[in-house]
Amino acid sequence: MTQLFYDTDADLSLLNNKTIAIIGYGSQGHAHALNLKDSGMDVIVGLYKGSKSESKAISDGLKVFSVSEACEKADWIMILLPDEFQKDVYLKEIEPNLKEGKILSFAHGFNIRFGLIKPPSFVDVVMIAPKGPGHTVRWEYQNGQGVPALFAVEQDSSGSARSLAMAYAKGIGGTRAGILETNFKEETETDLFGEQAVLCGGLSELVKSGFETLVEAGYQPELAYFECLHEVKLIVDLMVKGGLSQMRDSISNTAEYGDYVSGKRLINSDTKKEMQKILKDIQDGTFAKNFVEECDKDKPLMTKLREENSKHEIEKVGKSLRSMFSWLK
């Protein structure tokens, strides 16, 4: 059984007398910065000139500097920028300010795993990745709880990188819930696979195909939306709370029987083979290469696909129906 680590396993005092620079102040950035600040740490924020987040960070009681200035002042640098922007910002603003003894950290391993960022040997390189969105990380911390997190060490120059990563995880509230040790390779590959094969790519296409099948068979689009998209959350919430078994305990016998006899007709050995191909593209760097090239061209394919998908009938129907649900407003 994989070992989990909690508050008593991590020493927050290791962060004393260290200035922590949070680079970026979006969903994760604001949560990391404020949780660390409330844990008694010296936190500053690094943003590009003219960032819309600057006024928010200042109103939250944080000192804001340019990315370069923040990295120069900091002992610990946490990069919380979108994957496609990290390399350029690192080369121009962060790398010139790295000195022996500093800690470079990430919340996702993409740029390290695929060699886009290559830190010098004299810094620690670690990862602390909460398994939840930033607003949840902040909310849970404020309520005396925490969001589980992953932590990893890629490079241990100081000899204390593992303990430091665990201390940071404690500072943002992760050890209240439990933290799990991994490595950059494992975190990156599993995260990308989950997004592509199940959570985003797989689920989106499953929902659309189900909707299309019903509409093409003559059923009302509104009913197709309810059955194939709206109710997804009801089932997923049950799965998250108690696993597949509890979900099946909570649905009707008719639904459970249909689950067993029809699910495998859709998700079968051929589907799994395709999943394995997706995983291979992630492992051998094909996906990363294609994504980087797409971003270098200013995302023409992604923009085209985004526009096409936004025009799908399910989006039009959903926009109308969501106004019926007061809790979604």
UniProtKB/Swiss-Prot annotation:
The enzyme's E.C. designation: 1.1.1.86
Naturally occurring in which organism (per UniProt): Prochlorococcus marinus (strain MIT 9301)
Residues binding substrate, per UniProt: S252
GO biological process: isoleucine biosynthetic process; L-valine biosynthetic process
Cofactor(s) in the UniProt record: Mg(2+)
Active site: H108
Pathway where it operates: Amino-acid biosynthesis; L-isoleucine biosynthesis; L-isoleucine from 2-oxobutanoate: step 2/4; Amino-acid biosynthesis; L-valine biosynthesis; L-valine from pyruvate: step 2/4
Top-level class of the enzyme under EC nomenclature: oxidoreductase
GO molecular function: ketol-acid reductoisomerase activity; magnesium ion binding; NADP binding
Disulfide bonding pattern of the chain: none
Family under the similarity heading: Belongs to the ketol-acid reductoisomerase family.
Keyword Ribonucleoprotein tagged: no
Positions annotated to bind Mg(2+) 1: D191, E195
Domain KARI N-terminal Rossmann: 2-182
The protein's name: Ketol-acid reductoisomerase (NADP(+))
Domain KARI C-terminal knotted: 183-328
UniProt keyword annotations, A-Z: Amino-acid biosynthesis, Branched-chain amino acid biosynthesis, Magnesium, Metal-binding, NADP, Oxidoreductase
